[in-house]
Design a protein with these regions (language model features):
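Transmembrane alpha-helices and adjacent helix-loop boundaries
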Residues: 1-233
Length: 233
């Protein structure tokens, strides 16, 4: 076996590039989870609706998204749908990275993917709330919608927080697939640094450390929030 000769001195000058890529990953993941959570909330309300067509649409969406690879979905949104005349334009006022067509499309594709998983997390949280709470709300004269948003959802937040945190952590890691379509995330910096320094292993180690720091920090934050919520429960 050959000796492993690591030289991080040439990598140090590229730290601003790594950090810039890390910021793109954070923005991409945060945007995805926020939009995905909104989509998930709509989907779970559709699943809980008494209107059968909404149930069918929501379940079909969830099954398709969860049953196909995320990379395939990204390619469909970025390359397939434009052939049918459906595409997203870049937003130049956001800059070359955040406003690029690839970045905007990546957020849409990943958010729609995340929404399917978040809907299941939310459904579990909503179903965990005692049904007596719904009956109490209706007894107070609240409509079904008012009961859901005023009583049920606030109580379910504490239950779903760990699941949403896990989804955020998962998205930080899985968002690395956007590097395959040219989005300048932290994983894409590997291509830049490797081509400029001719070092292969060192950039991967740095990127691995960045991912670990991001996910570990988020995990610690979620545990802190859980403790705070349990304190006031």
């Amino acid at each position: 076996m050959g000796n492993i000769n690591l030289d991080f001195s040439v990598i140090w000058d590229w730290m601003p590039t790594f950090l810039e890529g890390a910021m793109v990953t954070i923005v991409l993941s945060l945007s995805t989870v926020i939009i995905g959570s909104l989509i998930g909330l709509v989907v779970v309300l559709m699943k809980m609706s008494n209107f059968k067509p909404l149930n069918i649409i929501a379940n079909l969406y969830t099954n398709i998204v969860r049953g196909t690879p995320m990379l395939l979905q990204l390619y469909v949104w970025l390359y397939g749908l434009p052939m049918l005349g459906i595409s997203f334009s870049g937003l130049s006022f956001l800059g070359g990275t955040y406003g690029s067509r690839e970045f905007i499309t990546a957020i849409v594709a990943l958010a729609i993917n995340s929404g399917a998983y978040v809907s299941e997390v939310l459904r579990g949280g909503l179903e965990s709330v005692d049904k007596g709470q719904t009956e109490a709300g209706r007894a107070l004269g609240l409509s079904k919608r008012e009961t859901m948003f005023s009583i049920i959802i606030p109580q379910a937040i504490r239950t779903v927080l760990p699941g949403l945190g896990n989804e955020f952590i998962t998205m930080i890691k899985e968002s690395s697939i956007v590097s395959t379509v040219g989005v300048f995330d932290v994983m894409y910096t590997n291509n830049i640094v490797k081509a400029s320094t001719f070092r292969v292993f060192e950039p991967l180690i740095v990127i691995g450390i960045i991912y670990f720091v991001l996910t570990f920090s988020l995990s610690a934050l979620m545990k802190y929030l859980e403790r705070r919520l349990n304190t006031y429960a």
